[in-house]
């Protein structure tokens, strides 16, 4: 979709401005719960229902932790002078 295409362009722009190590360091600095959910959702492309089952948490907790992880990463990007707002995917 058009929204997904725009999101990919924004994400690619962020990756071009930061090294892989900088991105890794930002993710590593997340609290462990947020980092785990972020990695499963964004890197492993798991659904919240799958994450909830795997981690023995509720889907609501999974969604909340992912949202909070993204907000913390956004703050880290802003601290580096990169404006980025992650759009919710449907």
Predicted regions and their residues:
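Internal acidic/polar
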Residues: 1-20, 47
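Helix-turn-helix DNA-binding motif, specifically the short coil turn and the N-cap/start of the second
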Residues: 47, 56-61
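Short amphipathic alpha-helical boundary/capping segments
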Residues: 22-31
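C-terminal edge and immediately downstream basic/flexible tail or linker adjoining helix-turn-helix-like DNA-binding
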Residues: 53-54, 70-90
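A short pre-motif secondary-structure segment
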Residues: 37-41
């Amino acid at each position: 979709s058009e929204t997904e295409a725009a999101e990919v362009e924004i994400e690619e722009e962020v990756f071009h401005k930061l090294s892989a190590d900088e991105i890794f360091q930002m993710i590593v600095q997340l609290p462990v719960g947020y980092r785990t959910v972020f990695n499963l959702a964004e890197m492993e492309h798991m659904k919240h229902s799958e994450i909830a089952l795997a981690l023995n948490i509720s889907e609501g907790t999974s969604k909340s932790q992912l949202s909070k992880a993204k907000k913390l990463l956004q703050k880290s990007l802003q601290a580096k002078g990169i404006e980025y707002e992650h759009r919710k995917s449907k």
